[in-house]
Regions:
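Nucleotide phosphate-binding/pyrophosphate-handling subdomain across enzymes
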Residues: 24-126
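Extended acidic/charged loop-beta regions that coordinate divalent cations
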Residues: 1-29
Length: 126
């Protein structure tokens, strides 16, 4: 799945609406129960793989089941909302950290509030 195949429509209230268009799946409005922008790519890949497996191996799974499960899944420790305006994310590499920061910036793009980031890493992870 390439970035040209999915598009974020709206990021609001802890959810993301997006579209996915490729040779295996076309949908103009999917919803994720997360403000984590990076999960759009992950879910797009998962949906596409499910559709491909369904087609190649004639797996009996409804498209609605694929979309509903992707849209309602909560990734614990990945942009997980603890309370209002407090999120935890287990990003463990530079790309993951940058994706988290991009998601936070997107959440606060239209706000006069400022985001604060508390970061911690174990020495063994450096």
């Amino acid at each position: 799945v390439s970035p040209q195949q999915y598009q974020i429509i709206k990021n609001f209230n802890g959810c993301i609406d997006f579209s996915l268009h490729n040779e295996y799946y076309i949908n103009n409005c999917l919803r994720l129960a997360t403000p984590a922008i990076y999960q759009v790519e992950n879910v797009s890949i998962a949906i596409t793989v499910c559709r491909l497996l369904k087609h190649l191996y004639h797996i009996d799974i409804k498209d609605s089941a694929i979309v509903d499960s992707a849209g309602s899944h909560i990734w614990q420790g990945r942009m997980e909302k603890l309370t209002d305006n407090i999120y935890v994310d287990g990003a463990h590499n530079p790309q993951g950290i940058q994706s988290f920061v991009n998601s936070v910036n997107g959440m606060y793009a239209d706000s006069t509030d400022k985001a604060a980031l508390l970061f911690s890493v174990a020495v063994s992870q450096l």
